[in-house]
Amino acid sequence: MSAVAKLAWKSLINRKATAILTIMTVAISVILLLGVERIRTQAKDSFANTISGTDLIIGGRSGQVNLLLYSVFRIGNATNNIDWKSYQEFANHRAVDWAIPISLGDSHKGFRVMGTNHSYFEHYKFGSKQSLTFSEGLEFNGLFETVLGSDVAKQLGYHVGSEIIIAHGISDVGFSRHDNLPFKVVGILAPTGTPVDKTVHVSLEAIEAIHVGWESGARLGPTPKAQDLKNRDFQPKQITAMLVGLKSRIQTFALQRQINTYPKEPLSAIMPGIALHELWGMMSVAEQALMAVSGFVVIAGLLGMLSSLLTSLQERRREMAILRAMGARPRHVFSLLISEASLLTAVGIVTGLAGLYAILAIVQPIIQQHYGIHLTLSLLSPYEWMLLGFVQCAGIVIGVIPAFRAYRQSLSDGMTIRI
């Protein structure tokens, strides 16, 4: 460390209170700037990694974003259902390689229940075309068996062999529960960092079975016992949506057009990638607003540092004069003020980074639980390094203003007593 840098460091230590406040101002600015950027990018990554390898999502006539949100992210509700015969027709279409039926509408203690079949565990992909795997047990086979997402099992303390009660609708209240039809947990999926972790999976037949006597949307009378229902043969009447994989992506647009003009019922077919792009387009204004607010906070922090340096410079006129009297040249005084600004900014950045990672470690499980966004404590990205470099350079530039004022002061200025 050079003599000027050592002197700058000792000068800041001598003015601890002011220096700490300035450092905290810069640190808060850095936390907000990088926090917004990290949440923005990782939210995108989390959404994009939720589903892969699916060529089309089919649901009742609806907008692209709405269909994507309720079928993949379990956000919102479907406008219409798909008739089971329509599902069978498209599942057996010559262009279709596989199809996954999805039936939504029930819940368990705040977690969505999804009816599906074996195709879901075989063909559903997330991330870089990763398949679902089990951390415990296996997929359901019996009527009243269920497979839990990792978050459901972890947060509610379930394990293979536990029994759960499903509630009708998304509000888990006493009068809406299927109390006499408990489901046995037979499998728990490995964590995926997607809405799969927050889902209770049952068979399509189970969805039909638990709604016997609930055809009007409410319990009309005594419901059959579980054993009586097991002896019946259930077939779905409707599903909420279906995920489709094609034999060749060349056929995507042709099949999409065929579904969108399907004469038997109003349906919509969307491509997940295009729907996600539309979703980001809708969110771009909010993203830009957040980044603008973060930028203004950084500017405010740097202006606070400028104010602190200018105020301290007025109080340090005698100190500067003594340095000049001891042989320091104007350029040395200039370098001293620049070094102080640089050190304040650098320490503020380091403090901000430490604070950011501490906050992320605390809020990570909370955001994962409530919003399904997986925040990672990863190393800084090149763009984040660039933002920090900008803050550091801006701090040095800010330091030029008091440094130039000190540079212009003569020896007699500091020795003159001002009243």
Regions found by a protein language model. Name each.
Residues G295-L303, L310-S312, R317-Q364, M386, ...:
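Transmembrane alpha-helical interface segments in multi-pass membrane proteins
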Residues S107-H118, G127-R219:
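Hydrophobic secondary-structure segments that place a key small or acidic residue at a functional site
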Residues R177-K184, I188-E287:
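Mechanotransmission and gating elements of multispan inner-membrane complexes involved in transport
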Residues G35-E122, E139-G142, N231, I259, ...:
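Hydrophobic, regular-secondary-structure patches
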